[in-house]
A protein has these predicted regions:
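Conserved short alpha-helical segments that host acidic/polar catalytic motifs at enzyme active sites
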Residues: 1-512
Length: 512
């Protein structure tokens, strides 16, 4: 867990982070919890083992895990065991504490005060039972102390407000402590995380909780990680707090920089505390980690899971004439607020009510699903993640590029891309907003504009002032002026770095 920050001043770079993994979800459409969903998700993880990576010790992996909807019966049992009576509004959080326990008291006190300040209460802590024997030497070397925090809130606090307060409390604790070996896997009234650097067939052995007879859920997201050019860390095992991701976000540096550039415009009116928390999106770690941070922030701002995902990972809409004009206006509106987090990427996610999957517009990560007569939906990187009789299958299919699928466990229905798109386009009059408040450059007739005239002497002075070389004038500026395109060429650039150059260089050259 500590590897990444220890290599901060080495040749290792967080930009090496890449993923290519196995993922999936299983949910009961009627929100009926069962141990079958947990057991089958673990079986699915085992069958996706070939999509993950295993260390040479044979026991340490790049990471695998489960993100499950709150197992209410199990949590009441756990709380009762340690003398805690749970009310209607409660939350559990899984926390990777530093291996060195000297700082644990301070960490717990900080959680206590920040949570109390927001009108909630820490009821207690639970040491998560684990079996270290199934860990390899690499996993053991960085094994954190895994604990669960138990939190209560007033009965009249709405669950969405409860989630927001938990989110703010976690961010405040992280900012105050600035402890690199502290990681909150999940802290929610809706979901709980179990993950780590163990091989998939050992996850239920490592976490005995997962085979407890009272451990039942109606929804589970699972993930098997394969990372290249990176060192496995406990906190980078997936699923994260909302999503699990297969692929790469190839635009990650741009996405992070654009977030930093416009972070002051991303304020959430009813969460003023967040103004002091930036950067909320990780500027290092893995691309998936940063994507989860951004999704979490949008959900805290009440965007909803569909709107948030379509903002982050939109389909290819610009040149698609088959798309409804109102839907196109919806996508255009959101494109003005955030650039796509482009893959290839396949993403499974949950907010506790919806379980969903989205493919980016490249569509280079497979996602197939089946719906069975017992009202379970299974979606995964491939078919055959568990055995079933074909006669039990009601519907099956795959996601195409830019598609999104979701199951609503509250209303017991499956929503396909067209259903989700209809919800989005009918939400607001995006076409009217664009017509009234935006201007397209194509509406201007630039030929009617009078060109600026420069005399020769002034033009020469300007070129010297801005450091325009003859090469730039001929090979860059002229093609742009004549053809409206960048000039093409195959020669390398052997120009000395500006700081070492004997010539006066443009200021911009220093930032290339």
């Amino acid at each position: 867990m500590t590897t990444g920050h220890k290599l901060k001043n080495s040749l290792y770079s967080p930009t090496f982070e890449r993923d290519n993994c196995g993922f999936g979800l299983i949910a009961n459409m009627d929100d009926k919890p069962s141990s079958w969903i947990i057991d089958t998700s673990i079986e699915a993880l085992n069958r996706l083992k070939h999509r993950g990576a295993v260390s040479d010790d044979g026991k340490s992996s790049d990471g695998c895990g489960l993100l499950i909807k709150k197992p209410d019966e199990f949590f009441h049992h756990c709380a009762k065991e340690i003398g805690i009576e749970l009310g209607r509004n409660y939350a559990f959080g899984t926390i990777f504490m530093p291996k060195n326990k000297s700082n644990h008291k301070k960490i717990k006190e900080t959680f206590f005060f920040q949570i109390k300040k927001l009108g909630m209460e820490v009821l207690g802590w639970r040491s998560v039972p684990i079996n270290k024997k199934v860990c390899g030497k690499d996993a053991l070397a960085s094994l954190p102390d895994i604990q669960q925090i138990i939190i209560s809130a007033p009965d009249n606090l709405h669950e969405n407000e409860f989630e927001k307060k938990l989110y703010v409390a976690r961010l405040q604790v992280e900012k105050i402590l600035n402890e690199p070996d502290l990681y909150v896997c999940s802290m929610s009234s809706k979901v709980i995380s179990y993950k780590g650097l163990i091989v998939s067939e050992n996850i239920q052995k490592f976490y005995p909780d997962l085979v407890h007879k009272k451990m039942k859920t109606s929804l589970c997201v699972f993930h098997q990680r394969f990372s290249t050019n990176t060192l496995p860390q406990w906190k980078l095992a997936q699923p994260f707090r909302h999503l699990a991701h297969n692929g790469e976000i190839n635009t990650i540096q741009g996405n992070r920089h654009w977030y930093m550039a416009r972070r002051n415009k991303l304020d959430i009116a009813d969460l003023p505390e967040l103004k002091e928390m930036h950067p909320i999106v990780s500027m290092s770690d893995s691309d998936s980690y940063s994507l989860d941070n951004m999704l979490e922030y949008l959900l805290a701002g009440d965007m909803g899971i569909f709107r948030a995902m379509r903002t982050l990972v939109p389909p290819a809409w610009q040149n698609n004439n088959k798309i409804d004009e109102k839907l196109k206006a919806c996508f255009e509106y959101h494109s003005m607020h955030m650039e796509p987090w482009d893959g290839p990427a396949g993403i499974v996610l949950t907010d506790g009510r919806y379980a969903a999957c989205a493919l980016d517009r490249n569509g280079l990560r497979p996602a197939r699903y089946i719906i069975t007569k017992d009202r379970h939906i299974t979606l995964a990187s491939e078919v055959g993640v568990y055995d079933y009789d074909d006669s039990e299958v009601l519907q099956k299919g795959r996601l195409a590029p830019g598609d999104m699928l979701a199951v609503d466990t509250l209303n017991g229905e499956v929503l396909l891309s067209d259903d989700i798109n209809k919800i989005l386009k009918d939400r607001n009059p995006y076409d009217e907003w664009l017509n009234k408040n935006s201007t397209n450059l194509s509406e201007y007739d630039l030929k009617k504009e009078k060109p600026i005239k420069y005399d020769t002497e002034n033009l020469i002075a300007y070129k010297k002032f801005y450091g325009v070389s003859l090469e730039e004038e001929v090979d860059v500026i002229l093609p742009l002026a004549k053809l409206g395109i960048e000039g093409t060429g195959s020669m390398g650039d052997d120009t000395p770095m500006p700081v070492l150059s004997k010539q006066s260089r443009s200021l911009y050259d220093y930032f290339r």
